[in-house]
Amino acid sequence: MSRRHFGYQDKVLLLQHGSTELLALAQRRGALLHKLLSGTGIFEQDLHKPLGRLHHTDWLTLLQNCRQQVQSPELPYLLGSALLNSRYISLCQSLQYAKNLRQALAQLYYFRHQLFPCFYIRLYQQQHCIVLEFKPALGLANQQAFMLTVLCSLLLSLIKQQLGTLSGISLQLQQSEESPALQQQLFGGLNLSFNQVANSLSIPLALWQQEFSHANAAEFNAARRTCRQLNRVLPTQRALPESICRLQRRALPQLLNQEQVAAALGLSSSSLKRQLSQHQTNFASLLDEVRRDAARQLLRQGHYSNRQLALKLGYSDEHNFRRAFKRWTGLIPSSFKGLFNFN
């Protein structure tokens, strides 16, 4: 049986799915290749191999080197656009030939391990919008905001390119505001907000199935076949934190302990604990995250009392749930519920 999760030292990233584009952008801005590759296990000749791979430790080092040598706030935005328009990435080609946004995002999510294995998405409907909530699948240290910007840049560039507008779309970010003039320049027409409880992109339902300007079923199917062939080299795997959150969500309102989760993932309890420390997290924090996300999703529906929510989340006492929710969001449940219009 193949492994269901990967670690920092597993080569699950293709060099031509991000690294070569990033290096090209940095070199055009005066950075030297040998300095960009310093501290990684990547050699210059590896960059020309169609299926050359690297692991996340090298990827994070590469990002750090580029950001140190290229003091350019637009770098993640440009990288997202470069990925979308790369002729070497079949997944991105398929997005541009998709019938509509719904098909494109389904394609991106299914094959995300080929391009963005560091994120997964929670999708839900809120009033007249579809909301994509971005969750880190593994620890990205101080590169998380950069990588999230790359992903959002790719998605928003796709929408702007295919539908001609970002009107009605909202991007909510947990981070504080940075380079507001640049963000407005690159994402004009977008409603941007910062210091939010989650990273999410809200898209009006009207745009969800609007036909793409470059829709082409034959080209889409051809690109999708190439993505499937690439799965032989990059089989579908998930990072350990994501796998744990997935197990805990399925188990609610029951709570799995560390030994149960480790057994389900084919690990010893000590190995699970050690690997989580490499992701700068721990078992209790991931359980907290699952409960917080489930609580917010249930509260958005507007149908549950605090007692019902406590039972659904595995709390024996509703007061413990209220305290936990206040710690997670800074709000009591009733105040959070009041942010939404349930009519």
Language model features by range: what are they?
Residues 14, 143, 147, 236:
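Short, contiguous, pocket-lining structural segments
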Residues 55, 83-200, 204-207:
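N-terminal regulatory/effector-sensing and dimerization cores
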Residues 1-128:
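N-terminal low-complexity or simple alpha-helical regulatory segments
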Residues 34-35, 146, 285:
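Short, solvent-exposed positions on alpha-helices
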Residues 177-343:
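Extended mid-to-C-terminal alpha-helical interaction segments
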Residues 23, 67, 109, 152-156, ...:
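Generic solvent-exposed, charged/amphipathic alpha-helical segments
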